[in-house]
Amino acid sequence: MTKQPEDWLDDVPGDDIEDEDDEIIWVSKSEIKRDAEELKRLGAEIVDLGKNALDKIPLDADLRAAIELAQRIKMEGRRRQLQLIGKMLRQRDVEPIRQALDKLKNRHNQQVVLFHKLENLRDRLIDQGDDAIAEVLNLWPDADRQQLRTLIRNAKKEKEGNKPPKSARQIFQYLRELAENEG
């Protein structure tokens, strides 16, 4: 018996099974390129980190070696190494790496915000005196009122005499120590 032309489609394997879970997801070539470029940028961010920060990111041995090599290479070789790191990242789960990197960035941002607050508090201490000292004592009850008054008095004298702000820096250092001892 010979098959009719319309029957030849019946022999396609898997054609008779219609499973909705096996739906093919089509991804455009542009989207694949964007993802690859984004992973290259992630790799470049990791390469730019210092050794201490790099230790806090979960990396396997191959990826770690590639990153350390990229840190030593300059110019065109570095670009090629970053492409390799991007390729290696495509084959791995990058979510833990992203989370660790975000955590490092967030810690740095929190420290910058704290320094700005301490600088503003220092400036208020120099400008307002006892009112600002009361605020500092509310924030840190173990702060030394006498030491603060001495530093403020010296900072005002330096400011009036157009001298370098040595005491203002000491006030900032003291406030930073208080903030670090609290946390």
Swiss-Prot record:
Disruption phenotype: Slow growth at 16 degrees Celsius, accumulates a pre-50S ribosomal assembly particle, although some mature 50S subunits are formed. Ribosomal proteins uL16, bL33, bL35 and bL36 are missing while 23S rRNA helices H38, the L1 stalk and H89 (part of the peptidyl transferase center) are incorrectly positioned. InterPro entries: DarP (IPR006839), DarP_sf (IPR023153). Changing D11A: Increased pre-50S subunit, altered 30S/50S ratio, severe growth defect. It comes from the Bacteria. It holds the Pfam family DarP. Keywords: Cytoplasm, Ribosome biogenesis, RNA-binding, rRNA-binding. Residues 111-183 are annotated as: Not required for functional ribosome assembly. One of its GO terms (cellular component) is cytosol. The keyword Iron-sulfur does not apply. Transmembrane segments: none annotated. The keyword RNA-binding applies. GO terms for molecular function: ribosomal large subunit binding; rRNA binding. Changing D16A: Increased pre-50S subunit, altered 30S/50S ratio. Changing E6A: Significant increase in pre-50S ribosome subunits. Has several regions, N-terminal loop (residues 1-25), a central domain (residues 26-105), joined by linker (residues 105-116) to the C-terminal domain (residues 117-183). The C-terminal domain is not required for function, while the N-terminal loop is; shortening the linker decreases assembly. Belongs to the DarP family. Interacts with RluD in late stage pre-50S ribosomal subunits. Interacts with ribosomal protein uL16 (rlpP), via the N-terminal loop of this protein. NCBIfam families: PRK05255.1-1. Member of a network of 50S ribosomal subunit biogenesis factors (ObgE, RluD, RsfS and DarP) which assembles along the 30S-50S interface, preventing incorrect 23S rRNA structures from forming. Promotes peptidyl transferase center (PTC) maturation. Binds pre-50S ribosomal subunits near the 23S rRNA L1 stalk, where it may mediate correct positioning of the L1 stalk. This is Dual-action ribosomal maturation protein DarP. It comes from Escherichia coli (strain K12).
